[in-house]
Amino acid sequence: MSSVLAAYEQFLQTTEDRGFGDQQFVQSDTLKAEIPVFVLNTNDPQQRFTLMNFCLRQAVSSSAKSAIKQGALLSLLSLQATSMQNHLMIAARAPDAALRIIEVDAIDPPDYTLTINPRSGWDDIKIRAYRALSRDLPISLADRTVFVSRDAEHAVCDDMDTYLNRIFSVLIQVWIMVCKCMTAYDQPTGSEERRLAKYKQQGRMLERYQLQTDARKIIQLVIRESMVIRQFLVQEMLTADKVGAYTNRYYAMVGDIAKYIANVGMSAFFLTLKFGLGNRWKPLALAAFSGELVKLKSLMSLYRRLGDRSRYLALLESPELMEFAPANYPLLFSYAMGVGSVQDPLIRNYQFGRNFLNTSYFQYGVETAMKHQGTVDPKFASELGITDEDRVDIMQSVEKHISGKAGDDISQPRSAFTMSLNRSAFITNNNPQDLSGARLSNYEQGWSGIDQDETRDTLPESTMHRFQNIDSTNSDHNELQMPEFENDINPFNHPRFTARAPLIPEISHQTPTIRMNRNVNIRDSTRDDRQDANEDRSSNIPDDILGDLDN
């Protein structure tokens, strides 16, 4: 039997192995679109700054074709190099690249009229056409410029230090748009603004040369559509990673942003390793996990064999990326997401509510994480010399502060209640259809499918003590026990509690006979008060008015 299991493990590794560089297989050339790129033959800062603005306008132009926008971005990414043409040779090695080098002798700042070297073979018609493209900006851009500041485009640039600050401010924004270009480009997450604020604080980006939001989105779509640009960017990130700590300003910036781009599209795989295998808890010994553990082992071997490019599989559109999809290990993925929802408050930003999410193993992961929040690793404790008394003290301290809290509750300030309420305890009877079409939260999707009668059996032990005072037949008593939630279509939001007026004691604790007699007395007294009020009102009417009515 052991030989069969070993053969199965080898079989999985063989199915994921791929041989690269085999001389027997040569890919056929495909048709390519010609990409015009501009190369400036001078290092004059004013000329380079003007070409930078010209390339930005070409990249966001409403009339420019895709190849023209791609060439403008490649030219923009090479404006920091001493020799632009040598730097563009990195992009020329791409299989789909058909670059046409356009040598520019000079460019006029006011209207972006190009002076093309005769070797490029351009006539006045193309020069006028590109000048018209640079003027045709989208109507969504304010002040007819790509920058937030309206006067930034036509500022004087007479020294190299000023030019470098401006070109790096623009390039760092282009690199920021690479982070989400292949995964969640149409989902605003706020990460873009946080990274812009980070580089402003570090002094790497000038706020005056911040691009407008619509301009950045257009640039992101150009990067998403172009394999040539993405292969060029991957090569730049690999270069920044290999040069080490002592590097120039540009590659230091690229190496920093590359940390955000690495392993994009593989979050499910790494989160499963972190929360599923990293804790080394006993549930990994389940027989249901045995097959998926072998799969994860083969995937880790595949990741190492792919080398440096394994971090950028999404940018390169590599077919190996499909091997790391969580559908290949659904049970371990569901269990890991349950553990992560308790341990990491930021896991709620990750959309793990997939069709293959197993709610039973998700709930089991939640219970396992809650059970182990106060435990101590025996091996590491022995290395630190922790005694049994210290271990008990540590477990009690942890249990005191975070026991019974979900991952979202740990990061929030303490409320007016002595104990924070776990959202998993307040599961309503509402069906998913009752939420007016709103998407269920990750945590609610994980707890979906549980009947109200089964809630007490499936919830973790740390939350069960909250139901001990609710089992009462008195409806008034039940209303006093539970706080009233504000109306919110998303039950996963943090509950805010409103003060509930107490019931009147003399009404709620009287017998029906006493209540009926009390109501009769109230009606009689009310009728007498109305009669007295009518008599007083009639006595206050003036006599002349009564006389006129009699006549």
Curated annotation (Swiss-Prot):
Keywords: Capsid protein, Helical capsid protein, Host cytoplasm, Ribonucleoprotein, RNA-binding, Viral nucleoprotein, Virion. The keyword Aminoacyl-tRNA synthetase does not apply. Its main location: virion. Residues 508-551 are annotated as: Disordered. Residues 524-538 have a biased composition (Basic and acidic residues). RNA binds at residues 180, 195, 260, 350, 354. The keyword RNA-binding applies. Residues 1-404 are annotated as: Ncore. It is found in: Virion; Host cytoplasm. Residues 405-551 are annotated as: Ntail. Forms the helical nucleocapsid (NC), protecting the genome from nucleases. The encapsidated genomic RNA serves as template for transcription and replication; encapsidation by N is coupled to RNA synthesis. Forms the encapsidation complex with the phosphoprotein protein P. Before encapsidation, the newly synthesized free N protein, so-called N0, is chaperoned by P. Homomultimer; forms the nucleocapsid. Binds to the viral genomic RNA. N0 interacts with the phosphoprotein (via N-terminus); this interaction allows P to chaperon N0 to avoid N polymerization before encapsidation. Interacts as N-RNA template with the phosphoprotein (via C-terminus); this interaction positions the polymerase on the template. Belongs to the paramyxoviruses nucleocapsid family. This is Nucleoprotein. It comes from Human parainfluenza 4a virus (strain Toshiba). The lineage of its organism: Viruses, Riboviria, Orthornavirae, Negarnaviricota, Haploviricotina. The gene is N.
